[in-house]
Amino acid sequence: MRIFKSHPLLKLVNSYIIDSPQPTNLSYLWNFGSLLALCLGIQIVTGVTLAMHYTPNVLDAFDSIEHIMRDVNNGWLIRYLHSNTASAFFFLVYLHIGRGIYYGSYQGPRTLTWSIGTIIFIAMVATAFLGYVLPYGQMSLWGATVITNLLSAIPWIGQDLVEFIWGGFSVNNATLNRFFSLHFLLPFILAALVLMHLIALHDTVGSSNPLGISGNYDRLPFAPYYLFKDLVTIFLFMLILSIFVFFMPNALGDCENYVMANPMQTPPAIVPEWYLLPFYAILRSIPDKAVGVVLMFGAILIILALPYLDKSILRGIQYRPLSKVAFYIFVANFLVLMQLGAKHVEDPFIVFGQLSTILYFSYFIIIIPLLSLIENELLDIATNYSSNKTLKNRKSLLSE
């Protein structure tokens, strides 16, 4: 349509969604972007709707959630959509990050895109934590108390900073109001960061591809080819999400959060949502509080250093067998950390957590740089051997 190329706003839509040239060999692993955009849209719409009926008060917050569930038209559907889409959001983000590591999407010229994506993930973690506090059940109260108390590990100003965040000497009305305001604001900041992520991707060289080579030689417009390909996974995602929302809405939640917050009674175990368990396991595996906090935040921030740690001359690990094995071990270790984060702080889980933490950081700091250098040398040896063999064959043909 001519209007898409003449209207100043629709021209942007046309260049990013309709006529955007994409490599012809993209697999379904490149569909996570559209699914994540859908998740963010669902979260913003359902979140704004829930905010219309929520009361950020320690006496009324729990009851306002029950009011939404029982009295608001389709309130149960809106709440379960919000909570289960949050889980889906993180699940897809982990797959998106994993695909980026596997195919080397962090390497130049996409380093800026990778950095913005990591900032998006950090903002997501903050938003999820703030949202977990709002229902003000037992896990909400004690989770907020434990996580905010981590800042007391900062020398000199730690305790003052914790009390400043609380607005008092414990979690109270001021805390809940602040968390609600920030939880409402952050998704819109996330949307702005997503736009920056998209601009950074399309204003460099566009999407990468499974081969790890330039896709400029063979490209297709995004619409209708990849638009319909995205719709396939969107419909599949909506089907799976509907199964969770309608048949097992609380499968990924914690039953303790259906008990009203009681500051006089500590729950048997204080655990965050499942998607934050790996980082919680790293925190708990370190006896020293300050070191544990540093490592927990470092576990996320170290992703920013990937472009500078990987010295390989090949993009991605699809043709690097040693790095491929190391990546699969890293994924398995991440899942182990997720399991350990839900366990009680006791032997042997403490020891397993420490070993998994060492392996997690070793993958980034030691294994990736070392294997990339080894594989570079092996590639040079193979290239020299191949060129020498070709030269000998040519000489033998000439002599004949």
Curated annotation (Swiss-Prot):
SUPFAM superfamilies: a domain/subunit of cytochrome bc1 complex (Ubiquinol-cytochrome c reductase), Transmembrane di-heme cytochromes. CDD domains: cytochrome_b_C, Cytochrome_b_N. It is found in: Mitochondrion inner membrane. Its main location: mitochondrion. PROSITE patterns: CYTB_CTER, CYTB_NTER. Heme b b566 binds at residues 96, 197. InterPro entries: Cyt_b/b6_C, Cyt_b/b6_C_sf, Cyt_b/b6_N, Cytb/b6-like_sf, Cytochrome_b, Cytochrome_b_C_euk/bac, Cytochrome_b_N_euk/bac, Di-haem_cyt_TM. A ubiquinone binds at residue 202. Binds 2 heme b groups non-covalently. GO terms for cellular component: mitochondrial inner membrane; respiratory chain complex III. Keywords: Electron transport, Heme, Iron, Membrane, Metal-binding, Mitochondrion, Mitochondrion inner membrane, Respiratory chain, Transmembrane, Transmembrane helix, Transport, Ubiquinone. It holds the Pfam family Cytochrome_B. GO terms for biological process: mitochondrial electron transport, ubiquinol to cytochrome c. It comes from the Eukaryota. The chain crosses the membrane at residues 32-52, 76-98, 113-133, 179-199, 226-246, 290-310, 322-342, 349-369. Belongs to the cytochrome b family. Component of the ubiquinol-cytochrome c reductase complex (complex III or cytochrome b-c1 complex) that is part of the mitochondrial respiratory chain. The b-c1 complex mediates electron transfer from ubiquinol to cytochrome c. Contributes to the generation of a proton gradient across the mitochondrial membrane that is then used for ATP synthesis. This is Cytochrome b. It comes from Epidermophyton floccosum. The gene is cob.
